[in-house]
Amino acid sequence: ASEDGGRGPYVQADLAYAYEHITHDYPEPTAPNKNKISTVSDYFRNIRTRSVHPRVSVGYDFGGWRIAADYARYRKWNNNKYSVSIKELLRNKGNGNRTDLKAENQENGTFHAVSSLGLSAVYDFKLNDKFKPYIGARVAYGHVRHSIDSTKKTTEVTTILHGPGTTPTVYPGKNTQDAHRESDSIRRVGLGAVAGVGIDITPNLTLDAGYRYHYWGRLENTRFKTHEASLGVRYRF
């Protein structure tokens, strides 16, 4: 151990593996038909994704308590989905002619935790000269962008049969199109918790294996939380 009892400013660099859970609340269909499917599918309402990102911190070690400011940027998530469903509306039992409802849904969505600027207070438990488990709390100012472009087109299709071995005639009928487009750039303050263990390699250099949970706050119609496992090094001056 150093003569100052482990006190002093420090810098830390981490590589974090993040599990991100994004939940969207989009408007429900306004049509009186309760069986109508919303233009935004469940796939884009409840997103689970994983990413790897770097994180840097600067702080001060008081010899038991530590305070640190950290900054991180996350990978942008984007995806698209196309789906088709056909529902039979009417069938003539005599000749087999029928009318179907064809629904096509095209969705494009993005989500990006642009940045997170946090402040943590951490307490180190000194088990011996090498190992120091820790726990702490974190408050962070986060910036998030997300967008959705969802279009649903429904078409009534009538199929006329002409007899065995012949090609049926298909008549597209009336169609409707509904769309939902949304793009937001939101900044909020959220809360979280940190835990881990520090392993002193030298009096000034520490290997840090950590976990952190963060709830980014209510982002308009979006709830966002992250679980992160990280490995890094901390150098105290």
UniProtKB/Swiss-Prot annotation:
One of its GO terms (molecular function) is porin activity. InterPro entries: OMP/PagP_b-brl (IPR011250), Porin_opacity (IPR003394). Residues 1 form the signal peptide. Keywords: Cell outer membrane, Membrane, Signal, Transmembrane, Transmembrane beta strand. Its main location: membrane. The keyword Repeat does not apply. It comes from the Bacteria. GO terms for cellular component: cell outer membrane. It is found in: Cell outer membrane. Implicated in a number of adherence functions. OPA proteins are implicated in pathogenesis and are subject to phase variation. Belongs to the opacity porin family. This is Opacity protein opA57. It comes from Neisseria gonorrhoeae. The lineage of its organism: Bacteria, Pseudomonadati, Pseudomonadota, Betaproteobacteria, Neisseriales.
